[in-house]
Regions:
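Mid-domain beta-loop-alpha active-site segment that forms a flexible
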Residues: 162-168, 203-233
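Short basic (Lys/Arg) and small-residue
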Residues: 120
Length: 233
């Protein structure tokens, strides 16, 4: 038995990132994936994937696709999810959904005293690149989560997953910037970022793509491009 098997974890979202990072870690360290939350439309694909990778004991909690763009879980769903989490004694959550759903799940787990590892960015309101009120929600949702966590942080941890802080390339760039600033005593006044993540989105994908999408009113800056902003801060 693994020393990590006592950690019962709920994973929210089984997308490409979760499969590449988290599932491999669960397998490597024999971590107990007690519960997986995803959309009803993904049921058969998820069951097939879990069986293929020997996660036969993992329970599924599926949510109707019509709720995927909400900012809070409907009471009937949150009540059922609370019961499942308590029954399975789950104390740790990894949120790896599309960013527009981050706030909904982060708020739920904070309210239920569950430790959280949240993929970056913290939140991504729909159409925040074209609607000023939606853009303001980035700060509003951040403040709301901070306030919630402030009242809970003696009991639980809430961490943001930003793994490229430890990437050799990013560390190299960061060190060069620090060296120049210190040596010449000059600030950084302008940054030009060009980033494509090694892929090209076809025109049709702007309307259909669900992984690293553009159709929800945010794009690369809220996905892989986020790491450059994180580096600068």
């Amino acid at each position: 038995m693994s020393k990590y098997s006592e950690y019962k974890i709920v994973l929210v979202g089984l997308g490409p990132h979760a499969k590449r990072i988290y599932i491999n870690l669960f397998k490597k360290y024999k971590i107990n994936l007690g519960l997986l939350i995803d959309l009803q439309s993904q049921k058969e694909k998820i069951k097939e994937y879990l069986n293929k990778h020997n996660f036969t004991e993992t329970e599924l909690f599926l949510i109707d696709d019509s709720y995927k763009d909400l900012t809070s879980l409907p009471y009937s769903i949150s009540d059922d999810l609370q019961k499942v989490i308590k029954l399975k004694n789950i104390k740790y959550a990894i949120i790896s959904t599309e960013p527009k759903a981050h706030f909904m799940y982060a708020k739920f787990f904070l309210e239920n005293d569950v430790n959280i590892l949240l993929d970056k960015p913290i939140t991504a309101p729909i159409c925040c690149n074209s609607d000023i009120n939606q853009a303001r929600k980035i700060k509003e949702e951040y403040n709301e989560l901070c306030k919630l966590y402030e009242s809970k942080k003696n009991k639980i941890n809430f961490m943001i997953q930003c793994q490229r802080r430890f990437h050799e390339g990013f560390i190299f760039v960061e060190n060069i910037l620090k060296e120049i600033i210190q040596k010449y005593n000059i600030p950084i006044t302008y940054i030009d970022i060009y980033h494509s993540d090694g892929m090209c989105a076809m025109p049709s994908e702007y309307l259909t793509r669900e992984n690293h999408p553009y159709k929800y009113g945010y794009g690369k800056l809220f996905h892989s491009g986020y790491h450059f902003i994180d580096l600068l801060t």
